Amino acid sequence: MAAMKSIVPLVMLTVLVAQSQLITQSEAQTCSASLANLNACAPFVVLGAATTPSSDCCTALQSVDHECLCNTLRIASRVPAQCNLPPLSCGGKLSWTNC
């Protein structure tokens, strides 16, 4: 019986860890799907593009979770260094307010 009492907390911990990993995977899939919807904004983020985004772009941007978008921008900002390139310098000020 004592062995059973010592196993129960271990089993509960294992279940909690597994559940948190499933939640994290689900959040990542939701984030990826939301980011894929931002393809509607692609025509508006190239040089010489129209200055007013479409309603589809605005709707897609509104539906993306703030943390999802900020995390993606943070990850993207590290890519040049990981490719042994200097950091990007865009001139002017870029604001990642609340990221």
UniProtKB/Swiss-Prot annotation:
Q: Mind telling me which SMART domains this protein's record contains?
A: AAI (SM00499)
A Pfam family this chain is assigned to? LTP_2
Q: Where is the signal peptide?
A: 1-22
Can you supply one Gene Ontology CC term for this chain's record? extracellular region
Residue ranges annotated as coiled coil are none
- Please give the superkingdom of this protein's source: Eukaryota
Distribution of this protein across tissues and organs: Stamen-specific.
Where is the protein localized? Secreted
Which InterPro entries does this entry report, sorted A to Z? Bifun_inhib/LTP/seed_sf, Bifunc_inhib/LTP/seed_store, NsLTP-like
Keyword terms: Disulfide bond, Secreted, Signal
Q: Which family does it belong to?
A: Belongs to the A9/FIL1 family.
Name assigned to this protein: Stamen-specific protein FIL1
Species of the source: Antirrhinum majus (Garden snapdragon)
